[in-house]
Amino acid sequence: MKKLTFSFISPERPIVQNQEADFVALPAFEGEMGVLPGHVNSVVILMPGFVRFKNNGEEKEFAIIDGFAEVFKDHIDVFASEASLSEEKQSEEQKQRLERAKKALSSQDADIDIELAEIQLKTQILKMKMKKRKM
């Protein structure tokens, strides 16, 4: 069976480099998008959600906030502004970020960027959901 070559990059580090995959699922703007070898070439806008890839029955999953993917017939490159692997433990710093985002949203301070606070809150909630799904 043909395989895709899968790479996943975030600003912090390359998360996956040139890994073989049978299937990749992306949280696309229009909904979840599945990619198999031979897929039509495309650029996909990614939304908050989970990127999954399967190889030989083994599946890995990552939480992302946003990004884009370049899909080709034989490979796929995912670029995410922030991502975390499901096996990574939630740090105390992530918990503090969640609390700060909640406080910023509930604040009546005119200097608060509400859109940014909402994104930060969604980011932290998504990461917590990732941890709960794997427990």
UniProtKB/Swiss-Prot annotation:
GO terms for molecular function: ATP binding; proton-transporting ATP synthase activity, rotational mechanism. It is found in: Cell membrane. The keyword Protein biosynthesis does not apply. Keywords: ATP synthesis, Cell membrane, CF(1), Hydrogen ion transport, Ion transport, Membrane, Transport. The keyword Transmembrane does not apply. Residues 86-102 have a biased composition (Basic and acidic residues). SUPFAM superfamilies: Epsilon subunit of F1F0-ATP synthase N-terminal domain. CDD domains: F1-ATPase_delta (cd12152). Residues 84-107 are annotated as: Disordered. It is a peripheral membrane protein. PANTHER family: ATP SYNTHASE DELTA/EPSILON CHAIN (PTHR13822), ATP SYNTHASE EPSILON CHAIN, CHLOROPLASTIC (PTHR13822:SF10). NCBIfam families: ATP_synt_epsi. Produces ATP from ADP in the presence of a proton gradient across the membrane. F-type ATPases have 2 components, CF(1) - the catalytic core - and CF(0) - the membrane proton channel. CF(1) has five subunits: alpha(3), beta(3), gamma(1), delta(1), epsilon(1). CF(0) has three main subunits: a, b and c. Belongs to the ATPase epsilon chain family. This is ATP synthase epsilon chain. It comes from Elusimicrobium minutum (strain Pei191).
